[in-house]
Amino acid sequence: MTPPSTAPDKPLTPRQAWQPFTPRGVAAFAHATLTRTVLVQLAVALLVAFSLLWFLRVAWSPVITEAIQHLPEAGLIQRGELIFTGESLERLAENKRLALVVDLASTRQAGHIADLEILFEKNRVVLRGPLGSWWQPYDARYNFSFNRAELGPWWGAWQWPILALVALATVVSLFVMWWSLALFYAPLVKLIAFFADRAVTWRGAWRLSAAALLPGAALVALALVMHGFGAVDLLGFALLYALHLLAGLIFNCTSPFFLPKFSEIASLKNPFGFYPSEGPAVKSLDAPETPARNPFTRRDGT
């Protein structure tokens, strides 16, 4: 009995480039069209944008709305100074994700419960988080409303346009980062493909590198949803975010091994420009040869 013949793996074709969540699926984008690659990127970018919108809508928007309702009727930031008629230390609203606090005396005694705490002090705004604090003085050139009567209608009218702008900025920034990082990873893909005897062009390596970053972006979208539901705390979210950076490197290093081999492509090529099955029939060696016609003889044979 003869062992069953194993057919070589077929080279990946653009029709297979539809999911970038496995090394083989990412490798398929090396031979896909730019349009197909951009469409898949757009789908993942929209997934990330909608996840971010959902997180902001669930975790931050209710806190901002409640904080505005707790503001006094009169309040203003004028000439770089907060004019506040309420308590000098007052927590306007908070949850586990965000806290808004007024601390005119800069006592910092309000406690730190939320992942991000925004303190409005007498002359500056302070952002406090696990990595430390960042502050910015109020711009003395402008006046800002800090009261319920003005901020309530403004927030009600501009909440959704602001969220839409955040979503648009997220999609655009993701495309810029993906294609920029792909330029950085493309030489690595080309180098790995060379030593692994795999065939890929520079454009193909660029598209493959761009597709290799999509699994990490999907992981960020999942982390946002899990953090919004409270399934992971801020530390868990930070670990997942760090893992998404590692995922891009892993897929860029493993996907080139699923590209078609040089030997497989060479076996399909014919030096005369056609495949053997498509070319003329091969002449038998026993068949008599037809003598070549002399180009200097006349048609009558003389």
Language-model regions, residue ranges each:
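Intrinsic disorder/low-complexity segments
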Residues: 1-2, 281
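Hydrophobic alpha-helical transmembrane segments and adjacent short intramembrane/lumenal linkers
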Residues: 150-269
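Long, solvent-exposed extracytoplasmic domains/loops
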Residues: 61-152
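Internal alpha-helical transmembrane segments
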Residues: 2-68, 222
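Juxtamembrane inter-helical linkers in multi-pass membrane proteins
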Residues: 10-24, 189-202, 267-278
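Short, highly charged, low-complexity non-transmembrane loops/tails of multi-pass membrane proteins
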Residues: 261-297
